[in-house]
């Protein structure tokens, strides 16, 4: 019975111990959550040091020494904190049964220092654990009642030492439990206090560390910021100066503006670099920050010196920069970076007079070269096209910026104007039939003249083969005549004996193209002209041109000239003369030249339209000269007319349109040479070029060749002159076009370049519309534009609803001398409309679908990873 009783008693104790143990475990788990980062110890003696700081209090609270070992093996994973006190309580294990209170007090005292000692060792984990423990501390206080299970430790020794005096322990357990309860309460209180202390320590440590880091960063930032602020202040000053400079420069030279921009960029770069360094310093350790701060301070000091000190102080900092800066103060704009590269002349280290500190700082930053502002200003103007501009020395005060910039620029402009006056312009004469329009086209005669208009007295020179003109070299370079005179260009164009002159259009059967694009025609046959007289087949052959006569061509060999023959046929009007055109030719021995008795006189050049465009040739023969007149209509902006007079006599050529004189638009006259039935014929060619806006088509134009002895003052009696008149044709050919409205409800027929109001006929499908089936509007002849007829037909959709698929439209316009038409097919308007509707609907639906898909993709929940 005793044995059975003992078994029951032991069983009850075991159950009680198990219950107590489970309670303790629960409490321990709560505690362990707070110290999860501290311990991984599984043996009491080994890992106590690592996790003791935080968990030593619970160890101390378990007054029975037995509990010390108990928590070591069993709650290793959950309550690593108990392990901390293990080392101290190890010897207590033996006396656990006897002196529970004493050992408890002792161990508590001993363990606590250990915990405090270990706490610093725990670097990052300690603060974190402490922070977490604080939260758990409350739980500990709450479970203080459960802490009664501190006796839990009692059950653990049994597991650790199965051979222990189990019976004795069991007997003693009851008193122990009672005592433990009392002590446990105290221990619980102690635990809370200890835990709080540990937590406080950890928090303090963390705060201290953070404060230190923050302090360092703050210090660095403050230092850096100071330097940056200083630099920024300097930069601002420099930038302000540049802005002022830019304002002055903008009105003077574009290059100066660019320079100002460059200066600003340089200043900004410096500021940015300083900022970048400061950022790096902040990120780097404290040591690096200190070093960087020093550098920043130095920079700031330098900048401050440059800004505050006068020009002399800046010179001390950088000799070259100071010199340039000081000088640049005179003309802050013209100096700058871009100008220095342009001109390196006249470098002089002129010390500037007292200059504004701001200007000095800016100049030093912008200019990095030694040349004085003098050369800089010169270069700025040179950029404006003044290769020969003279450098101007600037030796003055800041207010000199405007003066320095303005003076060189004026010189430059004058230089440009002077060079422009020596520029020679060359034009060429070309006459070619226009078979399509029934009129002939022409280009300008070859004439070299200068821009400067002047009134020069006509001079009389001997017209000889040797002195007739200036001989050009092989490079086709034009010889510039003296100012106010016009050089006479002599060239030759020959035709076969069968060539005739008259009011007829010459149909070219063989056309030769000169290298500059002009054409000369030979073997021509006359054809009646239905509308207007044509140019004569006489035309000027440029130096590099080709004629049908086998002669030596100046500037080109005959072989080279013949290479172009036969490859091009009748191009109406050709192209305007190339830059090589207009070279003056010299008669060759194999060309027929006029007799030495023949003389000619130059007329003054009047490109801008003067009223003295008179070409004078010696005395008029008793018979009247042959004169031909043609008008070119191929150019869109200008009407060109050419008048050719066969004569070796002195003549003056005048122009009239209607009753108004248009000599102001005379492009000048040239001498040319023709071959008529194998006999050389000399002719005078005058060209007129008038903007179409000043000309009303279908007006009469007259060319008059008057003897020079009849020219008296401004009045000329054209009745005593040989005249030729013709009608100015329309600027272009008659053409007709049909257009459909965007809605497909109207068809419009427009015919332009009409001489008179024509007759129009509309056909829709196989039906011919009556006159009341369409509307028409007539626009009369205006300057530069012939008549325009606009006709409109309404498109009726009702007929299409019954299956008609398309409609074809024909517009025929018949004028007095021409007929044009246009034919267009209009698709079914309903089909077009339906197609557009379907296309728009499809596009809209597609876009909506794409938007929906995108929305679904963005809002779809994503799977979480556990």
Curated annotation (Swiss-Prot):
It is found in: Virion membrane. It is a single-pass membrane protein. GO terms for cellular component: membrane; virion membrane. Residues 319-442, 464-499, 514-526 have a biased composition (Low complexity). Residues 443-463, 535-561 have a biased composition (Polar residues). Residues 24-185, 319-619 are annotated as: Disordered. The chain crosses the membrane at residues 835-855. Glycans are attached at residues 48, 518, 611, 659. GO terms for biological process: viral process. Keywords: Glycoprotein, Membrane, Signal, Transmembrane, Transmembrane helix, Virion, Virulence. Residues 1-25 form the signal peptide. Disulfide bonds: none annotated. Residues 564-574 have a biased composition (Basic residues). It holds the Pfam family Herpes_gp2. Its main location: virion. InterPro entries: Varicellovirus_Gp2_glycop. Virulence factor. This is Glycoprotein gp2. It comes from Equine herpesvirus 1 (strain V592) (EHV-1).
